[in-house]
Amino acid sequence: MQHKLLINGELVSGEGEKQPVYNPATGDVLLEIAEASAEQVDAAVRAADAAFAEWGQTTPKVRAECLLKLADVIEENGQVFAELESRNCGKPLHSAFNDEIPAIVDVFRFFAGAARCLNGLAAGEYLEGHTSMIRRDPLGVVASIAPWNYPLMMAAWKLAPALAAGNCVVLKPSEITPLTALKLAELAKDIFPAGVINILFGRGKTVGDPLTGHPKVRMVSLTGSIATGEHIISHTASSIKRTHMELGGKAPVIVFDDADIEAVVEGVRTFGYYNAGQDCTAACRIYAQKGIYDTLVEKLGAAVATLKSGAPDDESTELGPLSSLAHLERVSKAVEEAKATGHIKVITGGEKRKGNGYYYAPTLLAGALQDDAIVQKEVFGPVVSVTLFDNEEQVVNWANDSQYGLASSVWTKDVGRAHRVSARLQYGCTWVNTHFMLVSEMPHGGQKLSGYGKDMSLYGLEDYTVVRHVMVKH
């Protein structure tokens, strides 16, 4: 397995402390990788800064060609990437290959096209004898911090728009799941000029902090927890860096009495438990109107009970393990606290799976109340709660009564209600009669403590640029 870092166009071994990388399906150590040293972090940033002088002035066509080549080699090596992702994350292999790899390739291809559509503005004469122009220019060096739930996908979301806009990037994947990013480094080094892409390995304290705090870094992009976002914002405040934050969610799923219950059940069974629930948009916080509450709980419980946990390389496996032992304990603790309330009922699941690996049974909890921790706090596991509501006004207020603001969905046959409720929800995305669906052309990003800035779409590309005014006297 490729375990070297990419610094200034060269694959080099880390010079810091070795860290174990685990297979969460077995709990075994896959390998140990040496972290980047402080000197290597500095070298990566300085390489990116040096490369920016030329890369930032390349034409959109040149940048697009590089991104398209990278998309092609990812596609050609799709099986290799899927196997690495499956072993390192515990994802079902068929899901990694069939769902994630095509989406990752599409992100690079989309931004290759978008790079050629990012225009400034010829503003004209607002002062006699002077012509103004508006430019959108790259920022410089971007430090990108990717999470452990979708390692390669999030690397794509961060690399593609930044590079398309003309920036140079130093990427740090999670130390828990670094293998696909390091494999990407091996393939990218022969496509992009030296220093344009640098990929490091290490923990937040030893690598993330010196990277994000480096004086030559102009922007920090994070997908991670609220706590990590808060730390980075505080850590970078003195250098006034631009920050781009996607910090998780607790998606409300509002099910009205007139909803298609079978569609809701099928949707939540899929969208609430995909990737073992380790998704910031997971359909995890259901509000069911009183007329269909009992029916929904019964049917959904039966459906969730059929979800198959198992070995990632088994074609019939629907749920793999959680990413780490520490995360398994966090999920288990959240469910135990919910059970201890006395009013929350476990419909199915609610326990760790016996045997090796970090498996937690797909869980449905009914009877949750608005102020319960299971409703208010992100669990980030295969755990869905159901809360009864009376009317539209109540459920909109409850849905918005959350520190999160990333994703939401509304299930109803009433088109007017769908528009009315969607307009009032304080979430970056609202789906109607579906959930979880993402495309490269549409923006993804949150409000409130879920963060700010957009991934994907032309809005995502613009986030990696600076607006400049040029005035010419004539």
Curated annotation (Swiss-Prot):
E.C. number: 1.2.1.19, 1.2.1.-
Active site: E246, C280
Pathway: Amine and polyamine degradation; putrescine degradation; 4-aminobutanoate from 4-aminobutanal: step 1/1; Amino-acid degradation
Matching InterPro entries: Ald_DH/histidinol_DH, Ald_DH_C, Ald_DH_CS_GLU, Ald_DH_N, Aldehyde_DH_dom, Aminobutyraldehyde_DH, PatD
Superkingdom field: Bacteria
PANTHER family in alphabetical order: ALDEHYDE DEHYDROGENASE-RELATED
Family: Belongs to the aldehyde dehydrogenase family. Gamma-aminobutyraldehyde dehydrogenase subfamily.
Protein name: Gamma-aminobutyraldehyde dehydrogenase
Organism: Escherichia coli O9:H4 (strain HS)
Name of the gene: patD
